[in-house]
Amino acid sequence: NECIRKWLSCVDRKNDCCEGLECYKRRHSFEVCVPIPGFCLVKWKQCDGRERDCCAGLECWKRSGNKSSVCAPIA
């Protein structure tokens, strides 16, 4: 089962948000996966669709072929 990405609904799937995200009930709205404050993706973690979530000193690197992007040291 794919994890739920940032800003997508997590109604009935509270524990399925992607790493570093938590299910949050917005006022006057439904529950969505939001970033956990202070969390960042460490080196070699997948960052597809989460380019700004890599930790300091890392950037989301698009690997060749159909491989997923990962957080890698800034060259």
Swiss-Prot record:
SS bond list: 3-18, 10-23, 17-33, 40-55, 47-60, 54-71
Principal location listed in the UniProt entry: secreted
Annotated Domain repeat ranges: 3-33, 40-71
Keyword flag GTP-binding: no
Keywords: Disulfide bond, Ion channel impairing toxin, Proton-gated sodium channel impairing toxin, Repeat, Secreted, Toxin
Region (2 X approximate repeats with cysteine pattern C-C-CC-C-C): 3-71
Subcellular location: Secreted
Gene Ontology CC, one term: extracellular region
Tissue-by-tissue expression: Expressed by the venom gland.
Entry superkingdom: Eukaryota
Similarity remark: Belongs to the psalmotoxin-1 family. Double-knot toxin subfamily.
Chain's role: This toxin potently and selectively inhibits ASIC1a, an isoform of the gene ASIC1. It incompletely inhibits ASIC1a activation in a pH-independent and slowly reversible manner. This toxin acts by binding to and stabilizing the closed state of the channel, thereby impeding the transition into a conducting state. In vivo, this toxin protects the brain from neuronal injury when administered up to 8 hours after stroke onset.
Name this protein carries in UniProt: Pi-hexatoxin-Hi1d
